[in-house]
Amino acid sequence: MTINLTKFSLTILVALTLTACGSSGGSGDSQSAHTPSTSIHTQNNSTPNKNTSTPPVNVSNANNLEIKNNDKTGGAFIISGEDGHVTLKKVDITTNSDLNVLYIDGTKIPLSSPSIKSNGWLNIRSGTGKVSIDGIETSRDLKVCCGKYTDTRIGKVLSKNKNEDTYFFYNGNLTRNMPVGGTVNYNTGDSILSSYHDELGDTDEAVGTSQFSADFVNKKLTGSLSVNEKKLNINADISGNTFSGTTQSDAFKSQGIAEGKFYGENAKELGGLVKANDNSWSGAFAAKK
């Protein structure tokens, strides 16, 4: 569904209806007092769970963590340059006071609004001007996931001029009570990848799925991202409510690294970033039990 606006700094009031990816889609009513320039639509790229059973987890002896005000709640890649000459700078996100607002490198970016309901990906295009969401303006295009996650946000903020940066990001409400035993499967997940060497086929960006398994006894996280029939495997070590590791895939020329965090009660969700060692691709992912 699409909502159109023309004037700069307009407040978005929407009633959105999800469109299932790969199906004939659906339609809904929208409220707009203006003519086209800014568009918003949602899509659902999730696939049904293949296995929703989760082995029991020992949470009675959960490891309670102290969360401080200056703790790193997420992270972002600041992307600059053009295809073949891309540079990525990693920055930490240190606030999750509002998951609908992103604070990166001194910039405040609106991601969504309580009035916008989307279980899948939310796409906001600002056209040639600016869009205002809950009083916060941005001239960037946004791709944000997803309303299905109560404690996690991931996505991409796309610059349209040389004076602004493009970001991949993840952020959320850090887990305070980490499980200390058992294995948890995260079978419902989403991902977004950009490739600068045509490794995703006819597109340089695509959304897909993700799934993970966390072994809280041996402190290991394994999983994969699936985008455009390309699979990227992740192997990481768990430390507290964070994880870091490597990626491997026969579909990409360069292998890479992964990082992320657990979010919500008893680590019910996770989110993170991936990137190639040579910066030829990068992306973000999230998953939940």
Swiss-Prot record:
Residues 25-66 are annotated as: Disordered. It holds the Pfam family TbpB_B_D. InterPro entries: OMP/PagP_b-brl, Slam_hemophilin_C, TbpB_B_D. Residues 44-59 have a biased composition (Low complexity). SUPFAM superfamilies: OMPA-like. Residues 33-43 have a biased composition (Polar residues). NCBIfam families: slam_lipo. This is Uncharacterized protein HI_0973.
